[in-house]
Amino acid sequence: MSGDEMIFDPTMSKKKKKKKKPFMLDEEGDAQTEETQPSETKEVEPEPTEDKDVEADEEDSRKKDASDDLDDLNFFNQKKKKKKSKKIFDIDEAEEGIKDLKIESDVQEPAEPEEDLDIMLGNKKKKKKVVKFPDEDEVLEKDEALEDEDSKKDDGISFSNQTGPAWAGSERDYTYEELLNRVFNIMREKNPDMVAGEKRKFVMKPPQVVRVGTKKTSFVNFTDICKLLHRQPKHLLAFLLAELGTSGSIDGNNQLVIKGRFQQKQIENVLRRYIKEYVTCHTCRSPDTILQKDTRLYFLQCETCHSRCSVASIKTGFQAVTGRRAQLRAKAN
């Protein structure tokens, strides 16, 4: 009975509980002396019934101790894992940062030949270069240009004085620009209306055309138009007959009678050509002109710009010979 009492003693159960602490041997040195005793008690266990009860108690205690030990181990392991994970995370971040830098550098190097990036980066670099280096050249060029402009302005002011033309008092030849400026200045002095940029419009009465019978037309206001143009009726009559290719004469009412059927538009076109060639000035387009005849030539002299130019003589068109006597004379000749 002494053996039975030793088996069911609560102290023995406690010692068997300490059996389950193999994981804490390193931390607690006292547990090693206690583990030696349960080994001796195993040799004393004689009966199987008692072993079953002891095993059931041991299983319960094992489950509890294992759960406690696992909790302790999980707690320590969690702390240790967190510390290690922090260190690993830092290393990974550093490695990833290095990789990112390498990747960015690798991406930037092949991206340089692209047109868009080259344009953007190249423009910025070129702007910096243009700002740095060409500034001095540009400043020098601007200074030279300003000096040239100032000299030109000074020359223009000096030449525009009352001393005369630019080439006066010097042996140099005059230039085309100087002569052109002189011509325009004289024209502005003589004709101040041109300075304002207003062009004179030559206003003329429209011709009045009336049919006479079936084969003739009458130009009613022929003499009035000759007075407006300041031209002789004979000259205008010769031009009209040559352009129209007909024959005509002035009757007692100072009306021009022309053979053929003509409309008002046709006579207007002929009058416009006559005014353009024999009335308006060829240089200033002024209608204040005089038609003069000198040695079989007609000269048109302008009263505004005092220019004088020759004018072509009026030539009659081809006329067919219809009379019998004229035909015989032509054959004889």
Curated annotation (Swiss-Prot):
Acidic residues: compositionally biased ranges: 106-117
Positions carrying Phosphothreonine: 36
Chain positions of all zinc fingers (C4-type): 281-305
SMART domains: eIF2B_5
Regions of compositional bias (Basic and acidic residues) in chain numbering: 40-51
Gene Ontology molecular function, alphabetical: mRNA binding; translation initiation factor activity; translation initiation factor binding; zinc ion binding
Residue ranges, compositional bias (Basic residues): 13-22
Keywords: Acetylation, Cytoplasm, Initiation factor, Isopeptide bond, Metal-binding, Phosphoprotein, Protein biosynthesis, Ubl conjugation, Zinc, Zinc-finger
Cross-link (Glycyl lysine isopeptide (Lys-Gly) (interchain with G-Cter in SUMO2)): 102
GO cellular component: cytosol; eukaryotic translation initiation factor 2 complex
Subunit structure: Eukaryotic translation initiation factor 2 eIF2 is a heterotrimeric complex composed of an alpha (EIF2S1), a beta (EIF2S2) and a gamma (EIF2S3) chain. eIF2 is member of the 43S pre-initiation complex (43S PIC). eIF2 forms a complex with at least CELF1/CUGBP1, CALR, CALR3, EIF2S1, EIF2S2, HSP90B1 and HSPA5. Interacts with BZW2/5MP1. Interacts with EIF5.
The protein's role, per its UniProt record: Component of the eIF2 complex that functions in the early steps of protein synthesis by forming a ternary complex with GTP and initiator tRNA. This complex binds to a 40S ribosomal subunit, followed by mRNA binding to form a 43S pre-initiation complex (43S PIC). Junction of the 60S ribosomal subunit to form the 80S initiation complex is preceded by hydrolysis of the GTP bound to eIF2 and release of an eIF2-GDP binary complex. In order for eIF2 to recycle and catalyze another round of initiation, the GDP bound to eIF2 must exchange with GTP by way of a reaction catalyzed by eIF2B.
The name this protein goes by in its record: Eukaryotic translation initiation factor 2 subunit 2
Species name: Bos taurus (Bovine)
Organism classification: Eukaryota, Metazoa, Chordata, Craniata, Vertebrata
